[in-house]
Amino acid sequence: MSAKISETLTFECETGNYHTFCPISCVSWLYQKIEDSFFLMVGTKTCGYFLQNTLGVMIFAEPRYAMAELEEGDISAQLNDYEELKRLCIRIKKDRDPNVIIWIGTCTTEIIKMDLEGMAPKLESEIGIPIIVARANGLDHAFTQGEDTVLAAMAHRCLEQRLFVRERNGTIQKFPPPLEKEGEFIEYGDHPSLALFGSLPSNVASQLSPELRRQSVKVSGWLPAQRYTHLPSLGNGVYVCGINPFLSRTAATLVRRERCRLIGAPFPIGPDGTRAWIEKICPVFDIETQGLEEREKQIWESLKDYISLVHGKSVFFMGDNLLEISLARFLIRCGMIVYEIGIPYMDKRYQAAELALLRDTCIKMCVPIPRIVEKPDNYNQLRRIRELQPDLAITGMAHADPLEARGMNTKWSVEFTFAQIHGFANARNVLELVTRPLRCNDNLEDLGRTTLVK
């Protein structure tokens, strides 16, 4: 007699405390992605200490970000905020000459009601450099939402940024489009523009674009682009598609304010997710996919050595970076058992396609659909972990050491944020991260770890 497996997703919401990095940490990868930018954080010394300790960049390295520390005079309104920011931005222009300055507002600027949005337009007209204001403060649910805030603010500039650059440089076309290389000519279908949004390393973005190019789908641009002057043109009739699950605010901005058309698709994490991502995009342009099934099979074949290590193992997601649904779906497809998916925040509309793929994957693998807990209570989670005893807990850094001290295998979820995990070619990196603590403990057991400890 076979047990019936539920085919419905179960959502729960707790009101417990959750621990994550501050969203201003998004500067650590965005300043490297947007090469002609400069990030100016407006906050207290605490924000400065956090950035210095988190990024670990020395002063003499001259990174393209800085901290505007608020003093008592700023908080008590004894100083002129506009003049202080103007002085800093003029110095930034003189030293670095960026094409855009991005102000990152923090919790303190919210509390003292600093009008950054009101000062930015006046100041940018004075110094001749675009200034974008993003409120990436600690009031968000997860640190990855800092990128979401920055991209949503940057989306408003996509239509006007080329005109601004022409006026500033006095030239019609400062950056001409790259020429097609010989032997790489591809006949694209006559379809509307497609822009992808989400920050990825340049080499990963250059892997995803060719995957669509093989299907005769042309990517007109990325948000963010490698240079601010290369932002895509957005507007009515332009299709957009996200590559990360924590960009719901950007998606809403593109649809509501820029009148773009959002393609709801799973996210390109793992071979199954990448194939589903492409299969959602192509029909929108009346293009039939070719060779995707063979491409996915080829990748799964190359992952057999890792899959043999994780098959039958159990994993518990405590929730930290909003990548949990996509990672859980991929690991279930690899044969793992997911007890629980904790997630700091869930936008069911934006992640609808990913949730549907999670359900279909569980049905295909004949495993129960894990329950999804939004804003999990960490104390309740620890109790459930003690009861379930999973082989691996993917958790934030705050809980990793306490769990390790109790004999639990852990993996920092922040590592998945910075690792290259998107696309067919990088599926191996996900399993490398997941299996590392498992392989490490197996090697210690072979050395007689118990005897050594005693």
UniProtKB/Swiss-Prot annotation:
Protein name stated in the entry: Light-independent protochlorophyllide reductase subunit N
Keywords from the UniProt entry: 4Fe-4S, ATP-binding, Chlorophyll biosynthesis, Chloroplast, Iron, Iron-sulfur, Metal-binding, Nucleotide-binding, Oxidoreductase, Photosynthesis, Plastid
EC number(s) on file: 1.3.7.7
Assembly: Protochlorophyllide reductase is composed of three subunits; ChlL, ChlN and ChlB. Forms a heterotetramer of two ChlB and two ChlN subunits.
GO MF, any single term: ATP binding
Reaction it catalyzes: chlorophyllide a + oxidized 2[4Fe-4S]-[ferredoxin] + 2 ADP + 2 phosphate = protochlorophyllide a + reduced 2[4Fe-4S]-[ferredoxin] + 2 ATP + 2 H2O
GO terms classed as biological process: light-independent chlorophyll biosynthetic process; photosynthesis, dark reaction
Stated role: Component of the dark-operative protochlorophyllide reductase (DPOR) that uses Mg-ATP and reduced ferredoxin to reduce ring D of protochlorophyllide (Pchlide) to form chlorophyllide a (Chlide). This reaction is light-independent. The NB-protein (ChlN-ChlB) is the catalytic component of the complex.
Metabolic or biological pathway: Porphyrin-containing compound metabolism; chlorophyll biosynthesis (light-independent)
Binding site for [4Fe-4S] cluster: 22, 47, 107
Domain of life: Eukaryota
Compartments, as annotated in UniProt: Plastid, Chloroplast
Cofactor note text: Binds 1 [4Fe-4S] cluster per heterodimer. The cluster is bound at the heterodimer interface by residues from both subunits.
InterPro entries: LIPOR_BchN/ChlN, Nase/OxRdtase_comp1, Protochl_reductN
GO annotations of cellular component type: chloroplast
Pfam families associated with the record: Oxidored_nitro (PF00148)
Top-rank EC class of the record's enzyme: oxidoreductase
Record family assignment: Belongs to the BchN/ChlN family.
Cofactor(s) the protein requires to work: [4Fe-4S] cluster
